[in-house]
């Protein structure tokens, strides 16, 4: 089966982040199609799905990297078995606080699944209360299809505005590790976060993922200890 691995970067993306992303991908011998274009994220996903000749599509943010080659290969294998795969996320700002979905930070879908879901658009839709790529999971849930989400286990720092609740599961934030398989920085526009990404990428390529900073446990209760962006019910 033909697999297409894709990463989008905009002209204002931090060059150091993009270069370290490429370093990790090269280290694992992962062939990535990098698109350098100022295009809406969802529109880029839609265009890729409709113009690239592939059976399986992997979308990965420029600040999201696998901790191993096995992590990527396992996700692709799940996709071959009929699963929709991605990092677990919710979007608190659109009244969908408990609506977990496979986020586009790391997202895997087959062409067959895409057509079976009715070729939904990845563009965010306020009427449907969906964020980027969320409609894919919404449709998969409605059709009772197989879904595999990678859940956060630790994070490194507090985002501007406070840490994020993941429905009833726990919390996530800057430098989140998912299932010890993927790492997503978030908020790369802030220079203080870039160093965390560089440090993590260096640990990955040196084979020392055990040395990655995992300061905060995602399932611990941080209410009253760390600022929370959207404290449900208050």
Task: Go through the PLM ranges and name each one.
Residues 1-53:
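N-terminal anchoring/stem segment of glycosyltransferases
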Residues 60-62:
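Catalytic metal- and UDP-sugar-binding loop of GT-A-like glycosyltransferases, i.e.
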Residues 23-26, 49-51, 73-79, 142:
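Short, surface-exposed basic-aromatic patches at helix termini and helix-loop junctions that form
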Residues 130-234:
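C-terminal catalytic/acceptor-binding lobe
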Residues 57:
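Short aromatic/hydrophobic "clamp" motif used to bind/position activated sugar donors
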Residues 34-36, 88, 151:
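Residue-level recognition of beta-strand->loop/alpha-helix junctions
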Residues 65-139:
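Conserved catalytic core of nucleotide-sugar-dependent glycosyltransferases
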């Amino acid at each position: 089966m033909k697999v297409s691995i894709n990463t989008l970067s905009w002209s204002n993306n931090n060059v150091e982040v993009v270069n370290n992303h490429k370093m990790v991908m090269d280290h694992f011998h992962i062939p990535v199609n990098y698109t350098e274009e100022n295009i809406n994220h969802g529109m880029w996903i839609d265009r890729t799905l409709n113009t690239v000749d592939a059976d399986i599509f992997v979308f990965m943010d420029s600040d999201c990297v696998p901790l191993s080659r096995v992590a990527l290969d396992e996700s692709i294998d799940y996709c071959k078995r009929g699963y929709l795969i991605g990092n677990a996320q919710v979007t608190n700002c659109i009244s969908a606080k408990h609506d977990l979905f496979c986020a586009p930070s790391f997202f895997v879908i087959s062409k067959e699944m895409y057509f079976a879901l009715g070729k939904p658009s990845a563009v965010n839709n306020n009427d449907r209360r969906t964020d980027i790529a969320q409609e894919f999971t919404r449709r998969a849930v409605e059709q009772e299809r197989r879904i595999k989400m990678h859940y956060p286990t630790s994070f490194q720092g507090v985002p501007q505005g406070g840490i994020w609740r993941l429905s009833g599961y726990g919390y996530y934030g800057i430098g989140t590790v998912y299932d010890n398989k993927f790492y997503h920085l978030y908020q790369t526009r802030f220079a203080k976060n870039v160093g965390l990404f560089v440090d993590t990428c260096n640990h990955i390529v040196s084979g020392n993922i055990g040395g990655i900073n995992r300061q905060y446990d995602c399932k611990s209760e941080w209410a009253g200890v760390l600022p929370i962006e959207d404290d449900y019910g208050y």
